[in-house]
């Protein structure tokens, strides 16, 4: 049985070592169960791990929880509170709040859309890219444009 935290993708279920009972973050009582639920670096009884808005139980098998702003939320309340992250600067389509994104200055992109706008080379976290007139460019296309006098430096 494995329950995952959607924000971090880390397992929320672990076996409690014998003799060292953890305290529940919800009720402050010792957790005597064999398995521990962990969310926001705290331990919970199955009945105590609930959505901060609607109080629905999130400790059951198959449940999914979301964390943001130190809140533990069910999917419905997460989407209701945090909605969307806006529109993708490349394709203009809506980006759901729970989707991973790439950011460049004030622009937000789907992971699949975060690419050089001239050659379509995709970027990963840590890759060097250049931003000119809200256009994302790879190093090769940027340097070529700079040699031609097309672009001035705005390294990210």
From Swiss-Prot:
PROSITE patterns: LIM_DOMAIN_1, LIM_DOMAIN_2. Residues 24-83, 88-147 form the LIM zinc-binding domain. SUPFAM superfamilies: Glucocorticoid receptor-like (DNA-binding domain). InterPro entries: LMO_RBTN_TF (IPR050945), Znf_LIM (IPR001781). GO terms for molecular function: DNA-binding transcription factor binding; metal ion binding; transcription coactivator activity. Expressed mainly in the central nervous. Low level of expression in other tissues including thymus. GO terms for biological process: negative regulation of transcription by RNA polymerase II; positive regulation of transcription by RNA polymerase II; regulation of T cell homeostatic proliferation. Keywords: Chromosomal rearrangement, LIM domain, Metal-binding, Nucleus, Proto-oncogene, Repeat, Zinc. Its main location: nucleus. It is found in: Nucleus. It comes from the Eukaryota. GO terms for cellular component: nucleoplasm; nucleus. May be involved in gene regulation within neural lineage cells potentially by direct DNA binding or by binding to other transcription factors. It is linked to A chromosomal aberration involving LMO1 may be a cause of a form of T-cell acute lymphoblastic leukemia (T-ALL). Translocation t(11,14)(p15;q11) with TCRD. This is Rhombotin-1. It comes from Homo sapiens (Human). The lineage of its organism: Eukaryota, Metazoa, Chordata, Craniata, Vertebrata.
